[in-house]
């Protein structure tokens, strides 16, 4: 095939897509495991603390505070800079963020189970 502008364009597009897919597939099983861990923690919290009914408000307040603090740290300008992307503390913060997403999703699903 000759090197026309159209073939070069499609070659560059396919190379860009391939590099994006390879970047997203790094640590994919760990990310899924952390999401499921957060979902499991949400189920345990809803089951254990939901038995008495007295602890629901306190646990919900603590979870909301933890989620907001983590979101503040995750999206602050200190961690957004490019040179700290591969820092160990930033990678652990990303892992905790995946657990947080699983926790929120698990509580959301439990709320639907209780509502039906």
From Swiss-Prot:
Keywords associated with the record: Chloroplast, Plastid
Localization: Plastid, Chloroplast
Keyword Plastid appears in the UniProt entry: yes
InterPro entries xrefs: Uncharacterised_Ycf20
Highest taxon listed in the record's lineage: Eukaryota
Record's GO cellular component terms: chloroplast
Pfam families with a match to the protein in the record: DUF565
Protein family: Belongs to the ycf20 family.
Descriptive protein name: Uncharacterized protein ycf20
Taxonomic source organism: Mesostigma viride (Green alga)
């Amino acid at each position: 095939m000759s090197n026309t502008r159209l073939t070069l364009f499609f070659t560059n597009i396919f190379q860009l897509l391939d590099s994006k897919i390879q970047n997203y597939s790094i640590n994919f099983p760990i990310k899924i495991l952390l999401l499921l861990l957060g979902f499991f923690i949400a189920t345990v919290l809803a089951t254990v603390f939901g038995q008495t009914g007295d602890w629901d408000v306190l646990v919900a307040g603590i979870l909301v505070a933890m989620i907001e603090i983590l979101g503040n740290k995750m999206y602050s300008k200190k961690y957004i800079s490019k040179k700290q992307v591969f820092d160990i503390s930033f990678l652990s913060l990303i892992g905790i963020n995946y657990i947080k997403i699983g926790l929120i999703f698990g509580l959301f699903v439990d709320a639907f189970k209780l509502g039906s």
